[in-house]
Amino acid sequence: MALGAAPAAQLALLALLGTLLPGPGGAGISIHPSKAIIPRGDSLTVNCSNSCDQKSTFGLETVLIKEEVGRGDNWKVFQLRDVQEDIELFCYSNCHKEQTIASMNLTVYWFPEHVELAPLPLWQPVGEELNLSCLVSGGAPRAHLSVVLLRGEEELGRQPVGKGEPAKVMFTVQSRREDHGTNFSCRWELDLRSQGLELFQNTSAPRKLQTYVLPSIDPHLEVPPIVEVGSRWPVNCTLDGLFPASDAKVYLVLGDQKLESNITYDGDSVLAKAWMEENEEGTHSLKCSVTLGEVSRRTQENVTVYSFPLPTLTLSPPEVSEWTTVTVECVTRDGAVVKLNGTSAVPPGPRAQLKLNASASDHRSNFSCSAALEIAGQVVHKHQTLELHVLYGPRLDQRDCPGNWTWQEGSEQTLKCEAQGNPIPKLNCSRKGDGASLPIGDLRPVRREVAGTYLCRATSARGRVTREVVLNVLHGQNILDIVIPVVAVTLILGALGTAGYVYNYQRKIQKYELQKARKAQEEAALKLNAQSTPP
């Protein structure tokens, strides 16, 4: 790695290298580093170490600007500044009237100042060879400098950069159709990885290559094979590979009628867009013609125009009371078949029917009918959907209006109570006793004043239902009412436990003392009997 301006740590390292060289008895000079590569204009620190066993003169010999930045008895450190070109450096020593030298090669690298791809021909025939020139000005060392020819991001070739200013590097490629509009460029690469550095590179401004081709294929016509009477359908006609595409003329004709087209150009492609509308059933011919110069390419497609109205879907009646029989029927044109959701497998035909006993769960249910007609080998589908409305009375259940709420005072809560029914019932919840309203639907802090039992009434034209809702609010006082008895019971149980423990302990002590006294009496009696027995 190239050495720059020497910091204190680097100077210390160079000084250490000097102390490690052979001591008295030998004569010689060494240089460190033994080789280096640095950017042009950069600085380098060099150490000259002398192993002479007597006082001698030594130093660094160079034409470069140098500055001594450190020294010892047998070493000196020099700083070279503003190095512009490759050079060989010498450390010398005059010892015992003999001069010894040590040398190193200092390599300077710098980037090319300019790289350019020479101008391309205005038009390039497809299939012919194309000569491209990359011009490189400056850059060193040339032994590590090369040029790469790029097609977009693809690498086509690589060659070393020779001498000369600017250096000219030639490449030959065969132009292709897909090269039209492609950017070509030159990239120089200065590869100093073998020197402990990295790969440096830069790319020239791209030049776009224009290739000339007249295709022998017919235009591509995009049109639906079947269209409905009275509808408007997009038609696209494209042809790739034209140049210059802007000179191409495109015509779209339906039967004998020329369609108004919107023509756009993109590179070597031309695209014509038009809207097709036909009110007469039958098979019609659509033609696309692309003309460039005196040569034309034509294509033709047949379009079948059909009539297929939506199926007729009826609910009889569309709005019913709960538990009323509803008839669902779907009808389409002859030749088509219908499918009504909810019906079991029935023979396909133009008519389908379903009967059901409507319940509240059927309210707002969708009934769908699908009709299918085969036209020119393709199946066309039409769909119709209706919604059933079921009238039923108010309902208040646990899911939509829970009967019991217990919340902590001050917490943010939303009380939900919703009545079901069609028509939508009017809901009123008032507290027993004072008639206060239940705060439904809003997120708000819970206050103890809202606690109580509420009676919720849902009313509509189809009846009325009621439901009782209890709202409990936990607050400081009722928590104490719970905690104090619990603590009291705990203390009483603790006292009883302690008393029982003391009582049992005292009983065990008394029993132990009694057993001890009894044993002493028995031992005394045995001793007395032994003394009274004659020998």
From Swiss-Prot:
What is the membrane topology noted in the UniProt record heading this document? Single-pass type I membrane protein
The residues that the database entry marks as glycosylated are 47, 105, 131, 183, 202, 236, 262, 302, 341, 357, 366, 404, 428
- Disulfide bond sites: 48-91, 52-95, 134-186, 237-288, 330-369, 401-417, 417-456, 429-456
Q: Which residues span the membrane?
A: 481-503
A Pfam family it matches? ICAM1_3_5_D2
Give the signal peptide, or none.
Answer: 1-27
Q: Does the keyword Membrane apply?
A: yes
Which positions carry Phosphothreonine?
Answer: 533
Keyword Transport in record: no
* PROSITE patterns in alphabetical order: IG_LIKE (PS50835)
Give the record's PTM text.
Answer: Monoubiquitinated, which is promoted by MARCH9 and leads to endocytosis.
GO biological process terms, semicolon-separated = cell adhesion; cell-cell adhesion
Q: Which GO terms describe its cellular component?
A: plasma membrane
- Where does it localize? Membrane
Gene Ontology MF term list: integrin binding
* Ranges of the Cytoplasmic topological domain: 504-535
Give residue spans on the Extracellular membrane side: 28-480
Query: InterPro entries attached here?
Result: ICAM, ICAM1_3_5_D2, ICAM_N, ICAM_VCAM, ICAM_VCAM_N, Ig-like_dom, Ig-like_dom_sf, Ig-like_fold
Identify the keywords attached in UniProt to this record, alphabetized: Cell adhesion, Disulfide bond, Glycoprotein, Immunoglobulin domain, Membrane, Phosphoprotein, Repeat, Signal, Transmembrane, Transmembrane helix, Ubl conjugation
Q: Where is this motif: Cell attachment site?
A: 151-153
Q: How does it assemble?
A: Homodimer. Interacts with MUC1 and promotes cell aggregation in epithelial cells. Interacts with ARHGEF26/SGEF. Interacts (on T cell side) with CD81, CD247 and CD9 at immunological synapses between antigen-presenting cells and T cells.
Physiological role:
ICAM proteins are ligands for the leukocyte adhesion protein LFA-1 (integrin alpha-L/beta-2). During leukocyte trans-endothelial migration, ICAM1 engagement promotes the assembly of endothelial apical cups through ARHGEF26/SGEF and RHOG activation.
Name the family: Belongs to the immunoglobulin superfamily. ICAM family.
- For this entry, the protein name equals Intercellular adhesion molecule 1
Taxonomy, top ranks, is: Eukaryota, Metazoa, Chordata, Craniata, Vertebrata
